[in-house]
Amino acid sequence: IPSEKFYNRYFGETGWRAMTIRSLSIGQGEILVTPLQLANSMAAIANEGFYVTPHLNKNDTMQKRIHTVKVDKKHFPIVNEGMWRVFEFGTGRRTKIPDVSMCGKTGTVQNNHGKDHSLFVGFAPRENPKIAIAVVVENAGFGATWAAPISSLLMEQYLNGKVARTEMYDHIIMSTTNSDVKKR
């Protein structure tokens, strides 16, 4: 997240104002985050204020440091509710795993150098979360079109040990997000 120091260096001390940074509130502008950082933010929301250092081996206790975020716990329930509604009534409803209460946010990342990127962040299940995820599909357009279904299938595999929604799986596997790519 850019600081005042960053903006003073980038624009000069009198070269920026509130209008310069308003796009930060919707995740645009000079914000640079990795998918791993986005997944960590989902874990922090799912856990109401903490996340564990990402690790490759779940039995590696040396790597499981707990990090807390400086957000008052009273704010998490409303964020959780809003993210749950994405799957119940919003852009994620077509990708909901049956019988799993899910939370997430679809997004479209503007790309000045080509087609927009498809983004999804989320966690499941809503109660007692087991997985937090972030998926970015470059040059693929809307988050609900590509990143949300891919995330949903990955979460389903993780939670259930299999993917039962073969139609969605086949669609993802057999499709391309790049119209320049020819199918064999």
What feature does the model see in each segment?
Residues M62-H67, I150-R184:
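Short, gly/Ser/Thr-rich active-site loops of penicillin-recognizing serine hydrolases
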Residues N112-G114, T145, V163:
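Active-site-proximal flexible loops/turns
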Residues K130, F142-A144, G161:
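Intrinsically disordered, low-complexity acidic/polar segments
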Residues L38, G143-A148, S152-M155:
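Short, charged, low-complexity patches
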Residues I1-A140, T176, V181-R184:
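Beta-lactam-recognizing serine transpeptidase/beta-lactamase-like catalytic domain environment
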